[in-house]
From Swiss-Prot:
Protein name: Zinc finger protein 878
Gene3D superfamilies: 6.10.140.140, Classic Zinc Finger
The entry's keywords: Metal-binding, Nucleus, Repeat, Transcription, Transcription regulation, Zinc, Zinc-finger
Native source organism of the sequence: Homo sapiens
Record's keyword annotation contains Transcription regulation: yes
Gene responsible for this protein: ZNF878
The protein's role, per its UniProt record: May be involved in transcriptional regulation.
Protein family: Belongs to the krueppel C2H2-type zinc-finger protein family.
One cellular component (GO) term of this entry: nucleus
Domain (KRAB): residue spans on this chain: 4-90
Residue spans, zinc finger C2H2-type: 122-137, 143-165, 171-193, 199-221, 227-249, 255-277, 283-305, 311-333, 339-361, 367-389, 395-417, 423-445, 451-473, 479-501, 507-529
Length: 531
């Protein structure tokens, strides 16, 4: 039997052409080529391995190796297969006598953006291949996952998807032992160990492992967001972000946790959630050994060591280590708050903040401390609380060496050195170091007291005030002095008390140099100078 060279049935792209394809076009290409090779095998054809094994920078050649691996995963046989040809029809007929060539009438006149992709995705050697190809236009997905009902165009796609449910991870990293569902995933992971990052940004010097990551990164500098939601018009840096967002409109949540029944719309969120049950933190910082549940949070953490702030505000020039903090900041300029609570009409800049706020109405506190059983409405509050048990204070002030449990508390502290008070009251002009202080102050003008005690009906201007007040009913005093054993209702009272033992007086009068244990006592003292 004659040997069939890989190139006889392959679509060829240059590196430049491949880089221009969007992910959906690349995925279509992969699926079709996998099916093609299976079909050739089933009818007894052989192909030349030299192309599949060839390691080269060209992504297409690396893809050949991937196809070879995927082919070995499946024993499924097919009677006929799709052959995408790069030669004219008459040449094809000479190579494969008696085989008719079919052309798609649906896509024959539709341009996909690249002439080579246009040319190759239209011609087929078998009628069954044309039928398979037709699904890309009709949207037909006949292969369905038995676990979650998600549908796919190809049987190979549903088999790969089913591994998410089965937790089957046959591909293991030789360096760290981490297991993966697919060979492509383990190869991506191995780059973490090899530190091979061939794509370097000329603007900030950051190096990236993948061309797609590099292109997405460049959009942070240019501000370009080419992927737009057809429903609400919101734009995104990458197609994967757009896909995740689109599911927020459909309400589709295919990935369900077996432990708590919580559902998710994407597998990465589902895997991250599973680790909250298992406690697994597979991503470790090489500098401080701190571990994280996702590689995304590790990358953000690493920037604290390097000082890198790749997200820069075009309005004020301020830099940020994460896209989340950058987006939060952007909305301080616009004042945009599109997410509104249906119960109290309070509005938020981000849907995540709305979800956390809604828990104040429902009473839901999904984050529980394993040491003391205390529960929290948000993961941030929970992580901050955990550090009260461990004593961990990872955020250190470079000026005085004082350490803090959270980055936000450190930022507030830094302003005691700089004197910066960026939050000003529009009614009286009084300025504050933190936004929460301004909000509480504004309520002294409006008379608003949104936090009411259910036991006695007393109302308060802040959540902290009502929390401390509730402890007068319960008798709870969670802050205990290690030196004398005295306990306190609030952290402020506790800190003030600690200074009696240490002698610390951090609040100093600028006029006479006298120092005090608390800001309130300093303010009283300052008035004695004013007369």
């Amino acid at each position: 039997m004659d040997s069939v060279a890989f190139e006889d049935v392959a679509v060829n792209f240059t590196q430049e052409e491949w880089a221009l394809l969007d992910p959906s076009q690349k995925n279509l290409y992969r699926e079709v080529m996998q099916e093609t090779l299976r079909n050739l095998t089933s009818i007894g054809k052989k192909w030349n391995n030299q192309y599949i094994e060839d390691e080269h920078q060209n992504p297409r050649r690396n893809l050949r190796r991937l196809i070879g691996e995927r082919l070995s995963e499946s024993k499924e046989s097919h009677q006929h297969g799709e052959v995408l040809t790069q030669v004219p029809d008459d040449t094809l007929k000479k190579k494969t006598p008696g085989v008719q060539s079919y052309e798609s009438s649906v896509c024959g006149e539709i341009g996909i953006g690249l002439s080579s992709l246009n040319r190759h995705l239209r011609a087929f050697s078998y009628s069954s291949s044309l039928a398979i190809h037709g699904r890309t236009h009709t949207g037909e997905k006949p292969y369905e996952c038995k676990e979650c009902g998600k549908a796919f165009r190809f049987p190979s796609s549903v088999r790969r998807h089913e591994r998410i449910h089965s937790a089957k991870k046959p591909y293991e990293c030789k360096q760290c032992g981490k297991a993966f569902s697919f060979p492509s995933s383990v190869r991506r992971h191995e780059r973490i160990h090899s530190a091979k990052k061939p794509y370097e940004c000329k603007q900030c010097g950051k190096a990236l492992s993948y061309l797609v990551s590099f292109q997405t990164h460049m959009r942070m500098h240019t501000g370009e967001r080419p992927h737009k939601c057809n429903i609400c018009g919101k734009a995104f840096f990458s197609p994967s972000s757009l896909k995740r967002h689109e599911k927020s409109h459909t309400g589709e949540k295919r990935y369900k946790c077996k432990q708590c029944d919580k559902a998710f719309n994407c597998p990465s969120s589902f895997q991250y959630h599973e680790r909250t049950h298992s406690g697994e933190k597979p991503y470790e910082c090489t500098q401080c050994r701190k571990a994280f549940r996702s590689v995304k949070y590790l990358r953000v953490h690493e920037r604290k060591h390097t000082g890198e702030k790749p997200y820069e505000c075009k309005l004020c020039g301020k830099g940020f280590i994460s896209s989340t903090s950058f987006r939060y900041h952007e909305k301080t300029h616009t004042g945009e708050k599109p997410y509104e609570c249906k119960k109290c009409v309070k509005a938020f800049s981000f849907v995540k903040d709305l979800r956390i706020h809604e828990r104040t109405h429902t009473g839901e506190k999904p984050f529980e401390c394993k040491q003391c059983g205390k529960t929290f409405t948000s993961s941030n509050s929970f992580h901050y609380h955990e550090r009260t048990h461990t004593g961990e204070k990872p955020y250190e002030c470079k000026q005085c060496g004082k350490a803090f449990r959270s980055a936000s508390v450190l930022q507030k502290h830094i302003r005691t050195h700089t004197g910066e008070k960026p939050y000003g009251c529009k009614q009286c002009g009084k300025v504050f170091r933190v936004a929460s202080q301004l909000k509480m102050h504004e309520r002294t003008h409006t008379g608003e007291k949104p936090y009411e005690c259910k036991q006695c009906g007393k109302a308060f201007i802040s959540s902290n005030s009502i929390r401390y007040h509730k402890r007068t009913h319960t008798g709870e005093k969670p802050y205990k002095c290690k030196q004398c054993g005295k306990a306190f209702i609030s952290s402020n009272s506790f800190l003030y008390h600690e200074r009696i033992h240490t002698g610390e007086k951090p609040y100093e009068c600028k006029q006479c140099g006298k120092a005090f244990r608390s800001a309130s006592i300093l303010q009283k003292h300052v008035r004695t100078h004013a007369g």
